[in-house]
Regions:
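Short aromatic/basic micro-patch
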Residues: 8, 47-48, 65, 88, ...
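Residue-level detector of structured alpha->beta connecting loops
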Residues: 3, 25, 58, 159-161
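Structural core segment of the AMP-binding/adenylate-forming
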Residues: 1-52
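Short hydrophobic/charged patches on amphipathic alpha-helices used for structural packing
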Residues: 18, 63, 149-153
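Short beta-strand->loop structural element characteristic of the AMP-binding/adenylate-forming
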Residues: 1-19, 86-88, 117, 139-146
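Conserved AMP-binding/adenylation subdomain of ANL enzymes
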Residues: 95-114, 122-162
């Protein structure tokens, strides 16, 4: 329903996307988050490698100005409280959420913290910590796909001070 034309994919997700790409007729370009030398064999057509695209740029990026109320991203909900839907976030809402999370009455993040979100990155606690942790100087521990009890325990043992999760 978003009618996206470009899909950016982590290496771990290539097998999943290979199975699903046929039901996504609007996707014209797949960008894999790697470089060509680390790109595995794939049945995906018309792929580009993200790191190669970056290395081809001059480095003289010219920032554009925009309205803080413009959408900067869209996340899809799984429908926990209703039908699945796309939710747009504005530049302003992302900044305000990151600032709010660092406040003493919220997470009170500081450079002494190690933050580990165990929620998906499309969850508000997942995407916002990607902004609030660097803003406060906190370390950010990303568990990745290894969400077994043993793996989480080992990550917590590294000195994690704040874990973000969902109570359900």
């Amino acid at each position: 329903h978003a009618e996206d034309k470009i899909l950016m994919v982590d290496l771990d997700m290539i097998p999943v996307i290979e199975k699903l790409i046929g039901s996504c007729p609007k996707i014209a370009q797949v960008i894999i988050l790697t470089d060509r030398k680390n790109m595995p064999e794939t049945a995906l057509k018309n792929i580009l490698c993200y790191e190669d695209l970056l290395s081809e740029q001059s480095g003289n990026f010219e920032w554009i100005s925009g309205d803080e109320r413009e959408a900067c991203g869209i996340c899809y909900t799984s429908g926990t409280t209703g039908n699945p839907k796309g939710v747009t976030y504005t530049h302003r809402s992302n900044v305000l959420h990151a600032l709010t999370v660092t406040n003493p009455d919220m997470l009170n993040l500081s450079s002494n913290d190690k933050v580990m979100p165990v929620v998906p990155l499309f969850h508000a606690n997942g995407w916002s910590v990607g902004y609030s942790a660097p803003l406060s100087g906190s370390s950010l521990i990303l568990p990745g796909r290894e969400m077994t009890p043993q793996a989480l325990y080992e990550m917590l043992e590294t000195g994690v001070t704040i874990t973000l999760a969902v109570p359900t």
